Design a protein with these regions (language model features):
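Short coil/turn linker and secondary-structure boundary residues
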Residues: 116, 120-121, 213, 230-238, ...
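Residues that form generic nucleotide/phosphate-binding pockets
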Residues: 50, 54, 128, 153, ...
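Solvent-exposed soluble domains appended to multi-pass membrane proteins
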Residues: 250-641
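A broad, low-specificity signal for short, low-complexity segments enriched in glycine/proline
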Residues: 75-78, 86-89, 167-169, 177-182, ...
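The feature marks either
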Residues: 204, 211-216, 220-268, 276, ...
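Alpha-helix initiation and N-capping motif
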Residues: 21, 112, 122-123, 212-215, ...
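Transmembrane and membrane-interface helices of multi-pass
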Residues: 2-231
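Exposed alpha-helical structural elements
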Residues: 7, 42, 124, 136, ...
Length: 641
């Protein structure tokens, strides 16, 4: 046969095919989310900037093989390598687009770094997919295998009959290919190449993510992992002294409370309760947002929590720092401010020598433990806890004959039975104790025992029914605890790690950061607290009401005192928000100027508004603080190495 095709024919063919796939996928996603795209008048920008980002992705993916194809298109070895490259690259693109709808359904974003993080735990993720998303998994696998076969055959066809190019011409064409690929991948004549921030055009984070393609989104997120130590600098820079001055000023504490020149946030703290220090238990409820709590205006799914709320100190206006469990752990056990990096539970520099209240309490003679129904290795919890003050971890292998076992571990009832058994034994041995008890039943694929609750809806395995079972288990635990010998000497905090499925047509879906928090104990007076507070205020408050004084670097407020934090920090993927009590909000997105908004809680909307420059500086200072303390290993309870 005649050799009539350009040497770059295989590249052109696969570029066109993948552009079509990108466009059809984006079109389908946009039609699915048409209301949100229309709400920001985004149709034109979505497809124009989307095409731009698709070209960027394809220049990165096919630029190198295009160069080598120009040089070695007559080589049989290179043709085989090219076929593999074209096939695997295209299968990756297709697979990521197929995975996108399910990811958006759960996280309200295209696949991002969470997609990568879950790959570290294949057992748990595979079990979850098999139980709750089997049809989608089978379809995706079949489609991917068929696509692989088709792409492989197509690549074989594409590399045939390539017209030889003279060696004199090859260097010239190679330079042209390099120039086109470089300019296409950079897609900008500015000093910085294109990135997701440059093509974001709306106040809706999901719509902004639709501009990207999912393969690019995931690989860009992977590339960002290496910069986690200084991650917050994507919001801007500030002199360290000014950052610390602003943070300290926002706390309203005298300079004499700060006791270290080396550790800038280390303070001495006197507990409000002056009796014998109490045992402390934190019950961290998986995905139990305010939307599931009747007494906070949510669905009628929490009769047990609502009853308990009348007996303790209920925080009506508390906001989580993030949307992942590790972010909730970071806030409730370490009082650490959120950053755009992964939570410190997963970061290298915080696996030992990083402050937690477990470390503080262990040094004061407490037995410290983490009690979980799943496997302790998940989300790197075991490493973080063992390295930072938790002496004992009880996980799934430690349950003998559990009543019910699901994808993510034993049921919440089994968890609380084990917790009650553990606390009773420790109390009988005369050991003061601190424990973090982390539930898991309220998690996709929403498995829990039959016959425990009256189902809220059909079918059984839904988010609402699972939340109602989680509430039932809370009631089960406190029925046991109130009859125990340790009840009168223990303070309990029931708090959610985050809400379930944080989604909304705004850069930060503030409604889905609202979570319940309730402090209970024999000496805790019932009250409803309407102050705007953050998850990071809970460990400081808990220590104070339990009678534990000490030195620590946490910047949260002690809410037993006459103070009003009047602020909440919220991290939504790479976007951070600071909200004040008057509902003024500053939102910071990577490589962009901070913007002011006002939040309408009734309508759940954010509207642009000019806010004081001081508030923007306060937002930036707090956003930078966490990265600064982490990077320089300055989040400690003392100056000891």
């Amino acid at each position: 046969m005649k050799q009539t095709r350009s040497p770059l024919y295989p590249i052109f063919l696969f570029v066109i095919i993948n552009l079509i796939i990108f466009t059809l996928s984006r079109l389908g996603l946009a039609i699915w989310q048409a209301d949100r795209v229309s709400a920001v008048a985004g149709w034109g920008q979505l497809f124009l900037q989307g095409l731009r980002m698709d070209i960027v992705a394809l220049c990165y993916l096919f630029g190198v093989p295009a160069l080598f194809t120009v040089l070695f298109h007559n080589s049989r070895i290179w043709k085989m390598i090219l076929r593999i490259w074209l096939t695997l690259g295209s299968v990756f693109i297709l697979f990521m687009e197929l995975a996108t709808p399910a990811f958006i359904e759960t996280y309200d974003f295209r696949p991002n770094r969470l997609f990568i993080e879950y790959l570290i735990y294949p057992k748990e993720v595979f079990s979850m997919l098999m139980e709750g998303h089997l049809t989608a998994v089978i379809f995706s696998l079949i489609f991917t295998v068929v696509a692989f076969v088709c792409y492989w055959k197509l690549s074989g066809y594409a590399v045939k009959n390539l017209r030889p190019m003279s060696w004199k011409l090859r260097p010239v064409v190679a330079l042209l290919v390099i120039a086109v690929a470089f300019l296409g991948a950079r897609s900008s004549f500015q000093h910085r190449g294109v990135n997701p921030a440059m093509v974001a055009f709306s106040s809706d984070g999901l719509v902004n993510s639709l501009v990207l393609n999912s393969g690019y989104s995931v690989l860009y997120a992977a590339q960002q992992f290496k910069d986690e130590g200084s991650s917050s600098e994507v919001y801007g820079k500030m002199d360290t002294d000014e950052m610390l001055r602003i943070v300290k000023a926002s706390r309203g504490r005298p300079e004499s409370d700060y006791i270290s020149e080396k550790i800038p946030t280390l303070t001495k703290n006197q507990a409000t309760y002056q009796g014998k220090p109490k045992n402390i238990v934190i019950i961290l409820e998986e995905s139990f947002g305010a939307q599931f709590v009747g007494t906070l205006g949510g669905k009628p799914l929490s009769p047990e929590f609502d009853k308990l709320a009348k007996e303790g100190w209920l925080f009506e206006n508390l906001y989580a720092t993030g949307t992942r469990s590790v972010r909730g752990i970071e806030a409730t056990t370490a009082g650490f401010t959120p950053t755009p990096a992964r939570a410190v539970v997963k970061l290298n520099n915080s696996q030992s020598g990083f402050f937690t209240i477990a470390d503080l309490l262990a040094k004061q003679g407490y037995n410290t433990s983490f009690i979980y129904g799943g496997e302790k290795h998940f989300d790197n919890m075991a490493s973080f806890f063992y390295g930072n003050g938790f002496q004992t971890i009880i996980d799934q292998k430690d349950y003998q004959n559990p009543k019910f076992t699901a994808t993510w571990g034993v049921s919440d009832e089994d968890l609380f039975d084990k917790a009650n058994e553990t606390f009773t034994q420790l109390y009988n041995e005369g050991k003061p104790f601190f424990s973090l008890v982390f539930s898991s039943s309220n998690h996709d694929p929403f498995e829990f025992p039959d016959g425990k609750i009256e189902l809220y809806e059909q079918p059984k395995a839904t988010r609402n029914n699972s939340a109602k079972y989680a509430d039932y288990a809370i009631g089960h635990f406190f029925n046991l605890a109130k009859q125990s010998n340790y009840w009168k000497d223990t303070v309990f905090l029931v708090i959610a790690d985050h809400d379930s499925r944080a989604a909304g047509a705004s850069l930060v879906p503030i409604k889905h950061f609202h979570i319940p928090a309730l402090i209970l104990g024999d000496h805790v007076a019932p009250r409803r607290d309407s102050r705007l507070v953050s998850q990071i205020d809970m460990p400081t408050t808990l220590l104070s009401i339990a009678g534990v004084s000490g030195n620590y670097p946490m910047i949260g407020f002690d809410l037993t005192q006459d103070v009003n934090p009047d602020r909440a920090f919220m991290q939504f993927d790479q976007t951070q928000a600071l909200m004040k009590g008057n509902h003024d909000v500053v939102i910071q997105t990577p490589n962009s100027k901070a913007k002011g908004y006002v939040y309408d809680k009734e309508k759940d909307t954010l509207t642009e508004k000019e806010v004081p420059e001081e508030m923007k500086k306060e937002a930036l200072a707090h956003a930078l603080l966490g990265s600064y303390l982490y990077k320089n290993r300055l989040y400690k309870g003392s100056e000891e190495k």
